[in-house]
Amino acid sequence: MAEVHLRETDVIYVLEGTATFVTGGTVVDGRPTAPGEIRGTAIRDGETYRLSKGDVVIVPERLPHWFTEVSSPFLYFVVKPISQGGDSR
């Protein structure tokens, strides 16, 4: 599921497996699912990266992102620092 976090950064560390990771572009059929969270079915016009064991990705708040073409198993660890102030658009 494609998503955008309005106040969270994702720091992703891949532990095992491979996946295609898409960032940027526009979330297709995006809808709010929780405060500060938008999810959709895909991303249109994003940039594509191939991730594998040992890769680290930092996804800033407000940047659409999506895992696709995911191997099994695909294991990753994510830390989500949350923005505490400023604009809450």
Regions found by a protein language model. Give the residues of each.
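N-terminal secretory signal peptides
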Residues: 1-4
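Short, conserved beta-strand element in jelly-roll/cupin
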Residues: 6-27, 33-42
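His/acidic/aromatic-lined binding-pocket segments of jelly-roll/cupin-type domains
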Residues: 10-13, 48-49, 57
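Solvent-exposed loop/turn segments at secondary-structure junctions
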Residues: 19-21, 28, 64-66, 83-85
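A short, polar/proline- and glycine-enriched secondary-structure boundary/capping micro-motif
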Residues: 31-34, 87-89
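Conserved metal-binding segment of the jelly-roll/cupin
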Residues: 50-70
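A short hydrophobic beta-strand segment most commonly corresponding to one strand
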Residues: 71-88
